[in-house]
Amino acid sequence: IVNKNYYMKKFSLFLFSFLSLLYAQSDNSSLVVANVDSDTLRFQLKPIEVVGFLNSTNPVLTPFSITSLTAKQLSFGQRGMTLGESLRSVPGLFAMNDENFAQDIRISIRGFGSRSAFGIRGIKLFVDGFPQTTADGQSQVDNINLSYIQSAEVIRGSASSIYGNASGGVIQLFTEPYPNKTQIKSSISAGSFGYSNIQSSIGNGASNQKYLLKVSSKKYDGFRDNSEMSSFNLNTKSLFELNKNSQLSIHYNYVNSPISNDPGSLNKEQADDNRRSARIQNINYQSGEKVLQHRLGASYQLKVSTSSKLEIISFYTDREFSNKLPFENGGQVNLKRSYWGIGAKYVTDNYLFTHPISTTIGADISDQSDRRKRYNNIRGDRGSKVFDQLESFRNNAFYFQQSYLLNNKINVIWGSRWDNDKIESLDYYISDGLGSGFTSLNNASPFAGLTYLLNKSMSIYTNYSNHYETPTLNELSNDPDSLSVGGFNPKLNPQISNSLEIGSKGYVNNYFYYDVALFRSKIDNEITSFELEESPGKTFYRNIGESQKEGIEISLSSSIGNNITLNLGYTYSKFEYANYVKNNKNLNGNRLPGIPQNTFNSDIYYINPNGYFIMVGLTRYGIIYLNDLNDHEIDPYSILNLRIGNEYKLFGSKLKVHIGANNLLNANYFSNLRVNAWGGRFYEPAPQANIYMGTEVIF
């Protein structure tokens, strides 16, 4: 038996040798790519700037794993249907469900979020600083227009000490900047399986009152039966420069998705027989969803002095959601959600014993209210009401962070966040209100990190962090107890984790960037998903005793020639149950399902200054277990994608064209895997080779 620390010891030896080699290759006297005093980067490989991680902008000084993505990864020639297309290359991040828009994309970071049956759990999502994650930890991205996103940052690891509940990782998305003059864009894309996307935008950023408006209409027939979708999306933002020290930004988002059908999952025999088929129950019960959502946000920024600034944000979301599930009892859900919040953050820079110290203090208040009703699903028709409950989740929080540059070599960061969560259910179905309940949770999430500069462009770092995650309101309301008459599942509790990380990152010889991280997390009360025989297709949740997650993440980026960039990434994930007994079976040492043990990614970009580009991406996924017992798995598979495009200048305007091809190797893989599904229905097949093309005109 291989000792469980074997890989960690091997990695430590590799890290030491790797750093020694890099350090020997660097020349401190001539290599000036990271300036500590000015916090800027100068090198031939385009610099990374961290803009979403509180008050830190230099990744070499930051003792955390952060991946920054630019427009070439996010939007150049992409189909633009799901966020997973853009985040595929991030180490430690695993995305599924690019084809089932009724279930929404599933994203996990270092295993956090892997339990989700639909949407995103366990990680926080922001757009231009506004939270897209509700107070209880749910994120849906059906309202995000991916062509509107210009850059992104991913914090790979626990961040509850900064962002609170369900922050096993953080995804920060930033929309495109205001154009320097009045600019109009129009684009159209089309592709396999009835895909189409029509978009238009107008904006102007030349004055102190800037604006940008973008609309899009998407349709998709789907690879599988009963997988059609359509949506209309509108985004607008305005920036008002009130004076030289303050500005006000207002953002509005609207989405109307009247149809997103759910083809359901299949067992292995059904998937092998006909990959395009839908589960017959999903057709009979007309499974799918529709969404209508409005979101409004405002941000005020004030430069208090030359060394301090204040930011205040507020937001409100109104969401109406209804779906049909592939069973009768409670198989139709109607949800009306209101979610609002306000946050304030003050940052000041000073000196302590002649050394720079930066302090951030902040407070957040958010309130989520879900009116959830369930009806019987009579083969697509609404039956009698069987559930009616008002669920609320209120969060009050305070946090602080300090960053202290001890000398020109050592930077220390520490801080904590204190959260109070009030969770309540009011039963409107049973007249005596027996289903009502209330609980209050308090949590402190400390963290500390240290960075040591090997030279001006390379560093090693370590950090410790604490992460807590409450069950979402949806998870709490799905009580597996057949005698339950409403309220929340009293046996479902928050999970708590403690994480330790070491790593190194930096730039070598003006053309090479590396990022290597080793992490380990211990999770108590890990929340897992499962199904019951009497309710196939409905997901329930439970706590297991303990799990351990440890892994290695490596990413390399290099300019290998004129206009050519090569990105490589590797992730090793060893996520195991440590204290879990199920049906009298000891599952200690079993791997957590739904996550590949090994992932390798390779992207090569050629971008000609005249506008021509070609991008090739290859991703290799290792074995993925499908249930807690580890007696079902899928074999390793590889995905090869290609994007080609060009830009033409015509009469003062620009014409862009692109064509893309996905899964060129014709792999028979699965776009989604339903963990612990009853009856072996784990599989949602993905399409084989498919193409798309598009054009855009910029006036």
Can you describe what each PLM-predicted range is?
Residues 45-77, 103-108, 123:
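N-terminal periplasmic "start-of-domain" segments of outer-membrane beta-barrel proteins
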Residues 95, 123, 130-156:
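Short acidic/polar hinge/loop motifs at secondary-structure boundaries
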Residues 192-219, 224-262, 288-305, 353, ...:
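Transmembrane beta-barrel wall of Gram-negative outer-membrane proteins
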Residues 353, 408, 520-522, 542-627, ...:
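Gram-negative outer-membrane beta-barrel transporters
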Residues 354-366, 389-523, 571-574, 605:
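Structural signature of Gram-negative outer-membrane beta-barrels, strongest in the C-terminal barrel
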Residues 299, 310-315, 319-323, 453, ...:
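Membrane-embedded beta-barrel scaffold of Gram-negative outer-membrane proteins
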Residues 143-187:
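A beta-strand signature from Gram-negative outer-membrane beta-barrel systems
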Residues 241-242, 253, 402-403, 462, ...:
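Conserved C-terminal beta-signal and adjacent last beta-strands/turns
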